[in-house]
Regions:
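Glycine-rich phosphate-binding loop of ATP-dependent small-molecule kinases
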Residues: 1-268
Length: 268
């Protein structure tokens, strides 16, 4: 959302100072949510999908910046191996599902099948149709087993995607982010729109609905997504109290000389 108030710059984007203050506040709440998930033994699965450069990685980074990787962990699966290609399609994702007291963030997910794989011709039409039939029931099964499933689709316009790809292309330190798949995705932007619309038609279910995050303004998108994520839980502050640090125990021991160790050069 943009507006004419002083939270936004002349281009209608959220100001950095507003973003920084709000992000700090939200990250504090994410830490509290983390403790609540642990204390209640909740199993939370958050799916992040969208086009290349839509901002999925950015929001995942901010969610995990202050939380414990033992409780809030990222699952970003590589391309399937030859063995995995012979398995039930959902099988390789199952081992990454959350146990009690965990939140798992899926940076792309089984929805590769109905999006990038279908667009690029990496799956057959029969495989695509079977996915659309079986995915809703798979997710209902997860929900029935006690897993909270949240699905976010980051939506970036063709114009903004082009700007972000060009920015990566112009910056040597970021050029590695611009892959051949990104170039193909750019060319097939309309076909990706078809894939997304079909995916929603079949998988936007009551038990695990899709939530669309407009992401042309990355800052606003991150804040909006995290705010919504927090709103899905009626959590309480169960953070542990401050502890008293023990004094170092006096144990008779003489350490070896420091000069016997190899130190890195003191450049700074």
């Amino acid at each position: 959302m943009t507006g004419s108030d002083d939270r936004y710059n002349a281009g209608g984007r959220l100001r950095g100072s507003v973003y920084d203050a709000e992000m700090e506040r939200l990250q504090e709440q994410l830490v509290l949510l983390q403790y609540w998930i642990q204390s209640q033994g909740l199993k939370v699965l958050v799916v992040f999908e969208g086009r290349g450069s839509a901002g999925k990685g950015g929001v995942i980074k901010r969610i995990t910046e202050r939380t414990s990787p033992r409780t809030v962990r990222i699952a970003a699966l590589p391309r399937p191996t030859d063995r995995e290609r012979t398995q039930w399609y959902f099988q390789r994702y199952v081992e990454h599902l959350p146990a009690g007291g965990e939140m798992v963030l899926l940076d792309r997910s089984w929805y590769n099948r109905s999006n990038v794989e279908w667009v690029m011709g990496f799956c057959t039409e029969d495989e695509h149709q079977e996915f659309l039939r079986s995915c809703p029931e798979f997710e209902r099964m997860l929900v029935r087993s006690g897993i909270v499933v949240l699905k976010y689709w980051f939506s970036v316009s063709a114009e903004e995607q082009r700007r972000r790809f060009e920015a990566r292309n112009d910056e040597p330190l970021k050029r590695w982010k611009l892959s051949d798949m990104d170039l193909a995705e750019r060319e097939l932007y309309v076909r990706y729109s078809m894939a997304k619309d079909t995916t929603f038609q079949y998988t936007d279910i009551k038990q695990a609905p899709w939530y669309v995050v407009p992401s042309d303004d990355k800052r606003a998108a991150r804040l909006n997504c995290i705010t919504h994520l927090l709103s899905q839980f009626d959590y309480e502050d169960v953070a542990p109290p401050r502890v008293e640090l023990p004094e170092v125990r006096d144990i008779p021991y003489v350490r070896p000389p420091l000069h016997e160790q190899t130190f890195v050069p003191q450049v700074f």
